[in-house]
Amino acid sequence: MEDVQNSPAQVAMPIDRVGVKNLKLPLVVRDRAQGSQHTVATVDIGVDLPAEFKGTHMSRFVEALENWSEELDYNSMKRLLEDVKERLHARKAYALFRFPYFVRKGAPATASSGLVWYECRLTGELGDGKPSFLLELEVPVMTVCPCSKAISDEGAHSQRAVVRMSIRMTGFSWMEEFIDLAEAAGSSPVYTLLKREDEKFVTEDAFAHPTFVEDVVRAAAQRLEGHPHVAWFRVEVESFESIHCHNAFASIEREVRKG
């Protein structure tokens, strides 16, 4: 049969990235509490395309993922990228896995147990040299406004905020390490299951630890700078203001120099 993809391109221009998007895939990831957990990923995967070729071979991306059934980590992602490069005769390969990561969390007063989910993204790129990886996490927290607390006779406005972290690492770290440091930066973590005793505890504890988005982003950045395996990070905190019709945000980006 005629191989149209390998025919000459009408416009001889190289393509930076071409492939498939939004492919659903069952996935196993490492879990600090249980060793591993099963989740579902949405995958984007692609390669570069030289100027002389009309198109890529889309089916080969799906074949690569169908033949890949490993636990997701940096080493297995590297093997997947190498396989894609070889199948497509490409110089560069790229993959993005988006998935919910679940942590079972006990409520602070009653220890009632519930699963909290965190949106995660792992991106890998491989060219001629070493692969590069980027881990992204979204961690919800609660914040209480210090200004509102200072000027109000009763109470203060509070809201949910999200800590978004993008991290490049030099070694293995548990996802929970970054979840923990983000939650510690806010006024309080958030929970799935809370009884009345828990709600009382969370409300009073958060009120005792008021934080601006500026406080949260600085606290998270300080902890990321001190992490032994973090080489670069970007952290953004977005607060979904309860008494305003807009959101507040703050962000910090740093390259971490060790030693």
Swiss-Prot record:
Domain of life: Bacteria
Enzyme class, broadest EC rank: hydrolase
Keyword Cell inner membrane: no
Role of this protein: Converts GTP to 7,8-dihydroneopterin triphosphate.
Pathway participation: Cofactor biosynthesis; 7,8-dihydroneopterin triphosphate biosynthesis; 7,8-dihydroneopterin triphosphate from GTP: step 1/1
Keywords linked to the UniProt accession: Hydrolase
Name of the protein this chain belongs to: GTP cyclohydrolase FolE2
EC numbers, comma separated: 3.5.4.16
A molecular-function term among this protein's GO annotations: GTP cyclohydrolase I activity
GO terms under biological process: tetrahydrofolate biosynthetic process
Catalytic activity: GTP + H2O = 7,8-dihydroneopterin 3'-triphosphate + formate + H(+)
May be catalytically important (site feature) positions: C145
Pfam families linked: GCHY-1
Recorded family membership: Belongs to the GTP cyclohydrolase IV family.
